[in-house]
Amino acid sequence: MAAELTSTKLNAENHLLLDQPLLRLPHELARRNFKSVQRLVEREREYVIHALKEAANASLSNDQTPDQTLAALDSMLARMQNLKRKMESIQQEEKKIQNQSRKRIQHLEHLHQIPSLADVKYDQWSRIRLDRLVVDHMLRSGYTESAQRLAQEKGIEDLVDLDVFVQCQRIAQSLRRGETKDALRWCNENKAALKKSQFNLEFELRLQQYIEMLRTGDRGKLMDAMAHAKRYLTPYTETQSKEIHRAAGLLAFPQDTKAEPYKSMYSFDRWNHLSDLFIRTHHELLSLPSSPLLHIALSAGLSALKTPSCHSAYTSSSSNSLSTATSVCPICSTELNELARNMPYAHHAKSYVESDPIVLPNGRIYGQQRLLDMSKKLGCVETGKVKDPTTGEIFDESEMKKVYIM
């Protein structure tokens, strides 16, 4: 009895390992909002203090007329009003983030109030988490409208990162269309954070602009490309010298060249590379997992259940799908068999073998008594016959051979 209670006891901490991004992203967004406010206030403070000193000195020295002094004060007031509007907008965003964090903390707190895996409340909580994982997967796959509708239908808008992924997919799609404007604007907004990134997104975007100028073959564009490289590429000489040298060599090759690496640099496939690079950079800056959480959850479950027989020559999902009584093993199912193929096998320290194992002519091994009982329950075989519960094949009882394990 004690062992049974232990096996059904809910360990909330282990369950929450998968849900760390649920709180990490709002925290990261709140931190970025605070940094934005800090930069705005510092910039405007420096401007106003400097402008006040100039206006006061000019007024005392009679270098300005009263109208000019009033105009300077009006300019400062206008800037402060503009700062107020920006801070009000940021405050609204901050309230939204705080509300999301509150809802997410409440969702996670509910798990600590569930004592057992057998509790009906755990099924309800797990269903909400599954809905979250599905929405997350859909957002990452680009199905933003479907993800939004599912989140609204399930009432979990505050538990998923709709706005973040919608913006990410919008910019990624613009790059696939051959546009760099939105991505460069995003880089400018996150310039400070990008300095710590392991990826070189802004350099790659500027390099692509340079390539597009050369692609035209126009002499005027050639001069623009050289000026562009001097302004935007040369600051990266210390870290990207190899790529800059290649970019310089590109001046001597037309867009239809067969010479590498210039052929690859002119290739339109670079836009897909830039789109993928942006997504990786975006997720890194916001501390988002590189893989969908649904994949991570599935990988753990698949590895825990997978055995060598799931992908053996005698077991295939296609044969299972044709049988009237399919295997209960999820790894052997048509939906998950290929997905689990590259997963590691489960670590089984103990083996559990039937006390009366027999082997059928098709090579499958079962417990004799359990096989006979199942054949009787199915009620679709003649006397003296047995049915393989996995493949549906029928054999004579005399064809069963006893198995001895050494």
UniProtKB/Swiss-Prot annotation:
Span of zinc fingers (RING-Gid-type): 329-391
Compartments, as annotated in UniProt: Cytoplasm; Nucleus
Example of a GO cellular component annotation carried by this entry: nucleus
Pfam families the record matches: CTLH (PF10607)
Gene Ontology BP annotations: negative regulation of gluconeogenesis; proteasome-mediated ubiquitin-dependent protein catabolic process
Residues covered by the CTLH domain: 164-221
InterPro entries per the UniProt record, alphabetical: CRA_dom, CTLH/CRA, CTLH_C, Fyv10_fam, LisH, ZF_RING_GID
Annotated GO MF terms: ubiquitin protein ligase activity; zinc ion binding
Coiled-coil ranges from the UniProt annotation: none
Disulfide topology: none
LisH domain mapped to chain residues: 126-158
Keyword Nucleus: yes
Keyword field: Cytoplasm, Metal-binding, Nucleus, Zinc, Zinc-finger
Keyword Transcription regulation found: no
Function noted in UniProt: Involved in the proteasome-dependent degradation of fructose-1,6-bisphosphatase.
Family per similarity comment: Belongs to the FYV10 family.
Descriptive protein name: Protein fyv10
Gene name for this UniProt entry: fyv10
